[in-house]
Amino acid sequence: MKKILFMDTTLRDGEQSPGVNLNEQEKLQIARQLERLGIHVMEAGFAAASEGDFQSVKRIANTIQNATVMSLARAKESDIRRAYEAVKGAVSPRLHVFLATSDIHMKYKLCMSKEDVLDSIYRSVTLGKSLFPTVQFSAEDATRTSRDFLAEAVEVAIRAGANVINIPDTVGYTNPEEYYSLFKYLQESVPSYEKAIFSCHCHDDLGMAVANSLAAVEGGALQVEGTINGIGERAGNAALEEVAVALHIRKDFYKAEPSMTLKEIKATSTLVSRLTGMVVPKNKAIVGANAFAHESGIHQDGVLKEVTTYEIIEPALVGESQNLFVLGKHSGRHAFTEKMKELGYEFTNDERDAVFEAFKKLADRKKEITEEDLRALMLGEAAFAAQQYNITQLQVHFVSNSTQCATVVLKDEEGNVFEDAATGSGSIEAIYNAIQRILGLECELADYRIQSITQGQDALAHVHVELKEGAHQVSGFGVAQDVLEASARAYVHAAGKLKSFIQLVK
C-alpha cells in the first residue's frame, strides 16, 4: 500500500485569503502544529515577497525539526537565492520554483515563447539544485496547458534535477476524470517520470478540489498539496484533512495510506480558524461542529443501537474530544504542565509560570476547564505575549440614554503607560474609540465576530475583528471569559498590527 505525503501551504497559499494577515508569531504557532500533525512538507511562505515574509520563513526554517521547510520562488535567480538564504538553516530545506506553461499565461502574463519557458525552467531548476538538496517544480496552470508541451516542460525540469513535479489546477478548472487522465498521460509520456515524485495542487473554484486530489492519487500522485480547512485565495484550496481522512477510510479503494497524524486534525483546524479568523462552517466535513451530530430520530436510534449504522468516522480518529472536564482550580503546576505536554505544548520556565498564572485566574472563575479551554488559553497568551500593546485596565460605565463611556489603560513593550477615555453608542464602540485615541488611529471596523469556545454560562469568548485604514486591512483576536475584555483584546491585537504596518510602509 503506497504512502501519500502531504505538502501544506496554509502559511503561503492559505494566507492569501482576503482579510487574512498573520504575524510571525502566529505563523510559527501554525508551523509547530503542522509539525505535530505530521505534515511532510510545509511551504513557509514566499521569501522574496517582502522582508517580513523572509524573516517569517527563516524563523520557521530554523525552528522546525521534523518536516521539510520550503519557500516559493519564481523562476528568477534573485528569488531562488533569497529562498535559499531563508531556508538554508532548516533540517530539511526545499525550493519550490514555478513557471506558467499554459498558452494564455505565456502570451499575456509572461510574454514568453515556449522555447523561452523551457530554457527558463532548465536554468532555474539547475540553479536551485546547486543550492538545495531537493527542488520542486510547478507548471503553473498545468490543467490548461497543452498536454504535449506540459510533458516536455516536465521532462526538462526532471533532467535539470527536479525531485518533485507539481501539476497544479491553478484556477480550479479541471474535473476528476480529466485530472486522473492527465497524470496517467504524464506517466506514459515523460521519459524520466520514475526519477521524480509527482504532486497535485487543486483549487476549489468549481467545488472539486478534494475530489480532484483523490483522482490524482488514483492516477499516480504520491504527494497532495493543500491547506488546513481548505482556506486560500478565491474559493480556496483542497482541504488536506478531508483528503487524508478519505484516503484512510477508503484505503480499500485507493490502496493508499495518508502520512499524517490524524488525531491532530481537530486541534490544527481550530488553531488555523482562530488565528486567521476564518470560521469553519458547521456542516464542513471532518472538522465542522455538526460533522458527528445526529438530529434525525431514526439516525439517533440507529447510532444508539450500533454506531456504524450512520457514522463511518470515529470522532476520536481526528481528535474530536468529548470536551470533558480535565483540570480545575485545585490542579497544581505539575498536573497542569503534564496536561499541556499531552496536548503538544512545551514551555520555558518563564513561559510556564505566565501560562499557569493565567490558568489559575481562569480556574477561579470557571468551574471546569476543558481541553478546548486550555488550547484557547494558550492561543490567547501567545497573542498577548507577542503584542506591542497590552491592556492593563478597562472600565466601562453608563453616561446617558444609550451612551457609554470607556476608560482604557495600555502598556507598551517598553513599559510606557497610556490612558484615555471615550464615549460611544455602546460599550464596544466606546472601548474601541478610546483605543483609537491612544494609538492615534482612524480606522474602520470592517468585521466583528464573537464565538463561544465551550458551552455553559462560564464559557470563554473568542472575538475576531478586522480593521481597515485605506488599502491596509488586518485582523486580530482576543480570548477572555468576559466579552468586553475579549473584544478589547481583539481590537488592541489588530490595531497594533495596523499601526506597525502603516509605519513600515511610510
From Swiss-Prot:
Residues forming the Pyruvate carboxyltransferase domain are: 4-266
Which residues bind Mn(2+) per the record? D13, H201, H203, N237
MF term (GO), any: 2-isopropylmalate synthase activity
Matching entries from PROSITE patterns are given as: AIPM_HOMOCIT_SYNTH_1, AIPM_HOMOCIT_SYNTH_2, PYR_CT
SMART domains per UniProt: LeuA_dimer
Keywords, alphabetical: Amino-acid biosynthesis, Branched-chain amino acid biosynthesis, Cytoplasm, Leucine biosynthesis, Manganese, Metal-binding, Transferase
Subcellular location, in the record's words?
Cytoplasm
Report the cofactors. Mn(2+)
In this record, what's one Pfam family?
HMGL-like
Q: What's a single GO BP term from this record?
A: L-leucine biosynthetic process
Catalytic activity from the UniProt record:
3-methyl-2-oxobutanoate + acetyl-CoA + H2O = (2S)-2-isopropylmalate + CoA + H(+)
What Gene Ontology terms describe where this protein resides (cellular component)? cytoplasm
What pathway is this protein said to act in by its record? Amino-acid biosynthesis; L-leucine biosynthesis; L-leucine from 3-methyl-2-oxobutanoate: step 1/4
EC assignment: the record states: 2.3.3.13
Stretches the record annotates as Regulatory domain: 390-506
Where mainly located? cytoplasm
Concerning its family, UniProt says:
Belongs to the alpha-IPM synthase/homocitrate synthase family. LeuA type 1 subfamily.
Function of this protein?
Catalyzes the condensation of the acetyl group of acetyl-CoA with 3-methyl-2-oxobutanoate (2-ketoisovalerate) to form 3-carboxy-3-hydroxy-4-methylpentanoate (2-isopropylmalate).
The subunit field of the Swiss-Prot or TrEMBL record says: Homodimer.
Name by which UniProt lists this protein:
2-isopropylmalate synthase
